[in-house]
């Protein structure tokens, strides 16, 4: 069977599984779980992959799952990534009544996409004609939430990072992966699939580091003798004002964002607050900008403590690396070519390369950036949702677009990358220059945290 016929067989296998793929997306939507707690979703995914006859590895990064589909060679190995976790938005009408979890970022769609790829590759039998392998990865905890609880897991030695992909990297599960493919859902779009245009580097997402901050003062009676206390809340307020005063020093091109909230503001209104805790994220477009902002923030925090005679404890937490968008032009071309081959042109939008010298990345973060720093990665946008992402208004309104169409693009790319001795995949890996080596990843993060 020639290339065209085999590829058509693969795409037809996706269409034949459309109802099953949609059912998977619906099941995961109805069973949302926050990061590192996705036990039901992991079990559900494991069951489907095993029913396909695949050998499944479980409990990676606590709840992660992966299964490898072998072709004629073990390498190159392409990872198709789906994210297991949901957000916590109890105001959403379809959130879990007990936990408040809901898939208001569309990760249930990613999981349906990844499951669909496994179904189509196995059903079609095309891997017998392809020179490489595909690893279907279900990764936990993309959303950096419940940080205090995750720090408890760190203290227990169960985690080092906040993100599931980072745990996969740390534990070596990306060591035999050569290329990664991912996507993300958008809302209120006229298009159905969005692919990157242009050549060369383009701005992507920012990275971040986290901070857990504790101001320590001394309690006293708020009304009778407040002068006998040291007000930790006042120290925190001065520190936050000092951080705000630093914002003019952040370059626009660095896309710095410093945001925080108070997780403990005191114990009682008639007691001078003796301990105040904050949770903070520092986002920026480069590691250097993250370090610079972190230094300025720490200075402000210490200044607030000194002003009130309090003490402050600052714990730096590894976040996610900034995106490296230079990647591989051959990989981006493969994505565009497949999109136009498989879909109607009116269903697509192609991003254009930004010719301006000032190119500001968007402010969202994801641990897929860490993957993109160590290997070639391509992501595309998916429509089919409405409302505001990360909010109570989010919903999926076109399940075929959200759940099935991305499977076809993944399938087409995998086929082309591994066809004919995997020439295209090998070109992609030869073009790519890693920003961080897999073996040096942990040391790189430790250097960031130490400033």
What name fits each language-model region?
Residues 82-87, 186, 206-208, 263-266, ...:
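Short glycine-enriched loops at secondary-structure junctions
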Residues 92-102, 108, 124-259, 267-271:
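Histidine/acidic-residue-rich, glycine-tolerant segments that coordinate divalent metal ions
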Residues 2-104, 108-135, 140:
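Acidic/His- and Gly-rich active-site-bordering loop/insert found
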Residues 28, 67, 80, 107, ...:
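Divalent metal-coordination and catalytic microenvironments
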Residues 2, 234-451:
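Metal-dependent amide/peptide-bond hydrolase catalytic core
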Residues 76-79, 133-135, 178-181, 347, ...:
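Structural motif
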Residues 79-81, 90, 211, 216, ...:
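Non-cysteine beta-strand/loop elements that form the S-adenosyl-L-methionine
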